Curated annotation (Swiss-Prot):
<keyword id="KW-0805">Transcription regulation</keyword>
<protein>
    <recommendedName>
        <fullName>Homeobox protein Hox-A7</fullName>
    </recommendedName>
</protein>
<dbReference type="GO" id="GO:0140297">
    <property type="term" value="F:DNA-binding transcription factor binding"/>
</dbReference>
<dbReference type="GO" id="GO:0045656">
    <property type="term" value="P:negative regulation of monocyte differentiation"/>
</dbReference>
<dbReference type="InterPro" id="IPR001356">
    <property type="entry name" value="HD"/>
</dbReference>
<dbReference type="GO" id="GO:0006357">
    <property type="term" value="P:regulation of transcription by RNA polymerase II"/>
</dbReference>
<dbReference type="GO" id="GO:1990837">
    <property type="term" value="F:sequence-specific double-stranded DNA binding"/>
</dbReference>
<dbReference type="GO" id="GO:0045617">
    <property type="term" value="P:negative regulation of keratinocyte differentiation"/>
</dbReference>
<dbReference type="GO" id="GO:0001953">
    <property type="term" value="P:negative regulation of cell-matrix adhesion"/>
</dbReference>
<dbReference type="GO" id="GO:0048863">
    <property type="term" value="P:stem cell differentiation"/>
</dbReference>
<dbReference type="InterPro" id="IPR017995">
    <property type="entry name" value="Homeobox_antennapedia"/>
</dbReference>
<dbReference type="InterPro" id="IPR020479">
    <property type="entry name" value="HD_metazoa"/>
</dbReference>
<dbReference type="Pfam" id="PF00046">
    <property type="entry name" value="Homeodomain"/>
</dbReference>
<dbReference type="GO" id="GO:0048704">
    <property type="term" value="P:embryonic skeletal system morphogenesis"/>
</dbReference>
<dbReference type="GO" id="GO:0009952">
    <property type="term" value="P:anterior/posterior pattern specification"/>
</dbReference>
<dbReference type="GO" id="GO:0000978">
    <property type="term" value="F:RNA polymerase II cis-regulatory region sequence-specific DNA binding"/>
</dbReference>
<feature type="short sequence motif" description="Antp-type hexapeptide">
    <location>
        <begin position="119"/>
        <end position="124"/>
    </location>
</feature>
Length: 230
C-alpha cells in the first residue's frame, strides 16, 4: 500500500480544524508584540473572563448543591429529621436498660467458669468446717505407692515430698496412704508371726529412716486418718 494513502488520511483529519483559523492572519517570522490576532482575540477574551469565575468562591459553581437540587440551604441542617432522635435517646436507652442492657447473673457466670476450672488437691479448703471425703487414687498413683511401700514402709520427709511432687499429691495424702497401707499390711500378716510382721517382702528399712518417719507421724497424730483404701 502506497504512502500516499496515509498522507491523505492524515490530511483529512486536520482539514476540519482548519476552519477554526479562517480569520487568522498569515504567519510570519516577525510580527508586532502588541498586535492582536483577529482569530484569537475573541477566544482570549472569553477565556480571560471565564477563568476568574472558576476560582471565585462566590461563583455559582461553588454553591451548595442542596440549595438548588434539594431545597436545603446552609441553615437547613439544624432542621434535619435527625434532630428529633436526640429527644428520643433517653427513652430508647431506658428501654434497652430494662432488656438487653441488664447485667447477667453473676452466679451463672461464676458457675460456668468453675465448670471449666480444674481444682487441684492443694487448692481445696482445709478448714475445720470442711467435710472430708475419701481420697481416690489413679491406677498409676496406686502402683507407684505400692512399689514404694514394697521397699520402704516408712518414708522420710524428703522422700515424701519427692513422691508428692511426682504423683501430683500432697504430703498429707502420701502420709495417710502409707498409714492405711501399714495397717492393712499388719492385718494381713497378723497370724504369720512376728518375723513376717517385721517387714514386707524386700529390704528392711533402716533405723534412721524408721525413726524419722515415726517422729513425723507423731507430730501429725492429731490428724484424722481416712478409711482404708480397698
Amino acid at each position: 500500500m502506497s504512502s500516499s494513502y496515509y498522507v491523505n488520511a492524515l490530511f483529512s483529519k486536520y482539514t476540519a480544524g482548519a476552519s477554526l483559523f479562517q480569520n487568522a492572519e498569515p504567519t510570519s517570522c516577525s510580527f508586532a508584540p502588541n498586535s492582536q490576532r483577529s482569530g484569537y482575540g475573541a477566544g482570549a477574551g472569553a477565556f480571560a473572563s471565564t477563568v476568574p469565575g472558576l476560582y471565585n468562591v462566590n461563583s455559582p459553581l461553588y454553591q451548595s448543591p442542596f440549595a438548588s437540587g434539594y431545597g436545603l440551604g446552609a441553615d437547613a441542617y439544624g432542621n434535619l429529621p435527625c434532630a428529633s432522635y436526640d429527644q428520643n435517646i433517653p427513652g430508647l436507652c431506658s428501654d434497652l436498660a430494662k432488656g438487653a442492657c441488664d447485667k447477667t447473673d453473676e452466679g451463672a457466670l461464676h458457675g460456668a467458669a468453675e465448670a471449666n476450672f480444674r481444682i487441684y488437691p492443694w487448692m481445696r479448703s482445709s478448714g475445720p468446717d470442711r467435710k472430708r471425703g475419701r481420697q481416690t487414687y489413679t491406677r498409676y498413683q496406686t502402683l507407684e505407692l505400692e512399689k514404694e511401700f514394697h521397699f520402704n514402709r516408712y518414708l522420710t520427709r524428703r522422700r515424701r515430698i519427692e513422691i508428692a511432687h511426682a504423683l501430683c499429691l500432697t504430703e498429707r495424702q502420701i502420709k495417710i496412704w502409707f498409714q492405711n497401707r501399714r495397717m492393712k499390711w499388719k492385718k494381713e500378716h497378723k497370724d504369720e508371726g512376728p518375723t513376717a510382721a517385721a517387714a514386707p517382702e524386700g529390704a528392711v528399712p533402716s533405723a534412721a529412716a524408721t525413726a524419722a518417719a515415726d517422729k513425723a507421724d507423731e507430730e501429725d497424730d492429731d490428724e484424722e486418718e481416712e478409711d482404708e483404701e480397698e
